[in-house]
């Protein structure tokens, strides 16, 4: 059977108090609406339509990579009106449509799939996603007749018996497309708010003796975000889910409450993560690594057996058995080899560092190719920028760079060379050479006495 989905993402979200449309606020590094789109995709629903309104162009910009279509709700007149705006998307289609909100990022793909499967297997015209909660105050109650849904009653309209019902409407649905389109034509905005409500479709279907069912899920999954506090709550739940998955897969997380891992991160078993680490994007971390406190790793590949201390690694690759930090900064497009030492207060920018090379402290390497088994003394600077352009430096294997050396790019240092401490290198250093480029020391005896500087 054909399946499609509609995601409601047109509202501004005034209570979140932001210039940014509500659905574009991030939970664990990903926009809420993209969490929902990805849940649809992972539930094997490829045809997804996003209802846009406030900040429409920005929402399109942030979701376009997910290959979705869009329907515009220029004026926000309720959930029923939002779905009516997707009429062009639905017309000509057969099968079922899942309808979810773009501000409920905790929904799981398996829940979406189960809802759709339940709807199809029970041959329903509509199937609601519901939850059972201890305190349902403020929520619409699900009134059942056996297994089927009889009606949804808003809290303020509940009678003495209905007020005791703990099953609530989550605001997420699966509909038979033909039944939905027919019912949408009958929707009325004859209410205090002057809006069209999707819940009224259920009443219309029941009047036509159509079958309406419901599937209960964990209330946590259905949580929507209307404020910064609710966003923080949702992110906390999501972070706990992510961390629990890694724990179950053999990763040690010393303090899960203070470890921040985004959903697409992959971590190998027997890796140990201390508190304060932030691991973002599509980072892949190998096995047997140790991430000591307070590092940030973004969109990077970390090999096996790597140790990282209080450092920042962005869009780069770190080889096996390498150590980084403390307080190192590995900038984008850097490729650090195996068994390398990147020490304290070292900055690497868009450079390749060969295996077994040591850059132990207080060094800047930018736009460089560094060979294997090199050693950089403290205070080395690759001077890659002339004020207008960046230039490249090449350093061969087995080179020793003395302390306080400046390598003025573009320049090449051949294999097996030594550069004396304090040198400023502006020309090629031949293989097997010692390069000394500093002023000759001159001692002027009696100078202090004569100048009376004591």
From Swiss-Prot:
GO molecular function, one term: UDP-N-acetylglucosamine diphosphorylase activity
Region spans: N-acetyltransferase: 250-454
Positions with a binding annotation for Mg(2+): 103, 226
Region annotated Pyrophosphorylase, chain positions: 1-228
Keyword Cytoplasm part of the UniProt annotation: yes
Binding site for acetyl-CoA: 384-385, 421, 438
Role of this protein: Catalyzes the last two sequential reactions in the de novo biosynthetic pathway for UDP-N-acetylglucosamine (UDP-GlcNAc). The C-terminal domain catalyzes the transfer of acetyl group from acetyl coenzyme A to glucosamine-1-phosphate (GlcN-1-P) to produce N-acetylglucosamine-1-phosphate (GlcNAc-1-P), which is converted into UDP-GlcNAc by the transfer of uridine 5-monophosphate (from uridine 5-triphosphate), a reaction catalyzed by the N-terminal domain.
HAMAP family documented for this protein: GlmU
Name assigned to this protein: Bifunctional protein GlmU
Organism: Clostridium perfringens (strain ATCC 13124 / DSM 756 / JCM 1290 / NCIMB 6125 / NCTC 8237 / Type A)
């Amino acid at each position: 059977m054909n399946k499609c989905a509609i995601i409601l993402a047109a509202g501004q979200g005034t209570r979140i108090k932001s210039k940014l449309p509500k659905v574009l606020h991030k939970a664990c590094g990903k926009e809420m609406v993209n969490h929902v789109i990805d849940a649809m995709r992972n539930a094997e629903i490829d045809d997804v339509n996003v209802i846009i309104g406030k900040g429409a162009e920005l929402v399109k910009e942030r979701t376009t990579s997910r290959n979705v279509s869009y329907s515009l709700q220029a004026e926000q007149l309720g959930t029923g009106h939002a779905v009516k705006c997707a009429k062009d998307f639905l017309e000509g289609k057969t099968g079922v449509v899942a309808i979810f909100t773009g501000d409920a990022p905790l929904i799981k793909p398996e829940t979406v799939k189960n809802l759709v499967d339940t709807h199809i297997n029970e041959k329903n015209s509509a199937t609601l996603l519901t939850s059972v909660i201890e305190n349902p105050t403020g929520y619409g109650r699900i009134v059942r007749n056996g297994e089927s849904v009889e009606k949804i009653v808003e809290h303020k309209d509940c009678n003495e018996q209905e007020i005791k019902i703990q099953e609530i409407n989550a605001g997420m649905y699966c509909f038979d497309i033909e039944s939905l389109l027919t019912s949408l034509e009958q929707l009325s905005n004859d209410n205090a708010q002057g809006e069209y409500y999707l819940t009224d479709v259920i009443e219309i279907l029941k009047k036509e003796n159509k079958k309406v069912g419901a599937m209960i899920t964990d209330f946590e999954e259905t949580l929507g975000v209307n404020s910064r506090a609710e966003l923080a709550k949702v992110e906390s739940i999501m972070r706990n889910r992510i961390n629990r998955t890694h724990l179950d897969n053999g990763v040690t997380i010393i303090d899960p409450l203070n470890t921040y891992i985004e959903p697409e991160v992959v971590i190998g078993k027997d890796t140990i993560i201390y508190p304060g680490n932030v691991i973002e994007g599509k980072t892949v971390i190998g096995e047997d690594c140790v991430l000591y406190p307070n590092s940030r790793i973004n969109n990077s590949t970390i090999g096996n057996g790597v140790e990282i201390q209080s450092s920042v690694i962005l869009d780069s690759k770190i080889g096996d058995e390498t150590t980084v930090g403390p307080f190192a900064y590995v900038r984008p497009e850097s490729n650090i080899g195996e068994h390398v030492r990147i020490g304290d207060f070292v900055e690497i920018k868009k450079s390749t560092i060969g295996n077994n090379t040591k850059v132990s402290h207080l060094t800047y390497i930018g736009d460089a190719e560094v060979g294997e088994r090199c050693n950089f003394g403290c205070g080395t600077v690759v001077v890659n920028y002339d004020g207008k352009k960046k230039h490249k430096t090449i350093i061969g294997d087995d080179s020793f760079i003395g302390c306080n050396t400046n390598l003025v790019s573009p320049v090449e240092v051949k294999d097996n060379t030594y550069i004396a401490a304090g040198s400023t290198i502006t020309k090629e250093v031949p293989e097997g050479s010692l390069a000394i480029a500093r002023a000759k020391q001159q001692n002027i005896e009696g100078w202090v006495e004569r100048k009376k500087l004591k």
